[in-house]
Each structure stands twice: as structure tokens, then as C-alpha cells.
């Protein structure tokens, strides 16, 4: 394998995240994000390891209009997934991502997902990126 064991480990999806695959797949389809199910599960893995009531850590995102916009404000995993998918789709669109193989744009979108897409892209624009 071209990756060291350590990197491979970091990219593995645990059982808790894998258990959400069907739900993530069906929700992703509603937002034309079916090609990104593995990426979405990787985001979930990174954000929460599939634990808790806000597995996508999307409480503070723009799409959360039902729960407090504070860490772990969302108490419904399904709603967290829906918000997280919309947030990532928005970030991918803003990054100009052309598809699941456009890794440089995906990296940009993932950074935007973490920092909040609008403020992140505004920051890049202001700093000439």
C-alpha cells in the first residue's frame, strides 16, 4: 500500500459511523450528494467518531435552525446528518469542486466545513487566495 499504516488508520470508518451509512446515503441522495457518502462518513469520523447526538458536529452551522447554535446543541442525530450534508454541499459548491476526485477543492471544502464556509471563503478572498 502506498500509505503508511498510520495514515490508513486515520481514514478508516469505525463501526459507529458505518452504522449511519444507510441514513447518510438516503439523506445525501436528497441533496445530490450521493457521490460523497464516503467523504461524509469520513467527516463524521473526524468530527465525532459517530458518537453523541450531533455526529456531524453541525450545531454551529448555518443549516441548524432548530437547536441552539452552540457545540453539541443538536440532540437529534438525523437532523445533525441533514445539516452536515447541506453544510458540506455548500462548502463544496463554494470551493468550486467538480466531483469526488477533485481533491484540492475537497480539501478546501473540508477546511471551510470546519471554520464555517462563508467566513472561511471571505478570509481567503481578503487574503488574495
What are these regions (language model features)?
Residues 3-129:
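Catalytic glycan-binding domains that act on GlcNAc-containing polysaccharides
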Amino acid at each position: 500500500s502506498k500509505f503508511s499504516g498510520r495514515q490508513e488508520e486515520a481514514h478508516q470508518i469505525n463501526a459507529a459511523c458505518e452504522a449511519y451509512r444507510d441514513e447518510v446515503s438516503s439523506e445525501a441522495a436528497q441533496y445530490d450528494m450521493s457521490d460523497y457518502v464516503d467523504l461524509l462518513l469520513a467527516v463524521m469520523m473526524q468530527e465525532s467518531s459517530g458518537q453523541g447526538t450531533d455526529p456531524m458536529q453541525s450545531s454551529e452551522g448555518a443549516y441548524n435552525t432548530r437547536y441552539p447554535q452552540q457545540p453539541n446543541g443538536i440532540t437529534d442525530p438525523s437532523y445533525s446528518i441533514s445539516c452536515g450534508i447541506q453544510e458540506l454541499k455548500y462548502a463544496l459548491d463554494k470551493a468550486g469542486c467538480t466531483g469526488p476526485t477533485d481533491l484540492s477543492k475537497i480539501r478546501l471544502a473540508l477546511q471551510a466545513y470546519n471554520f464555517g464556509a462563508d467566513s472561511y471563503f471571505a478570509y481567503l478572498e481578503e487574503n488574495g487566495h
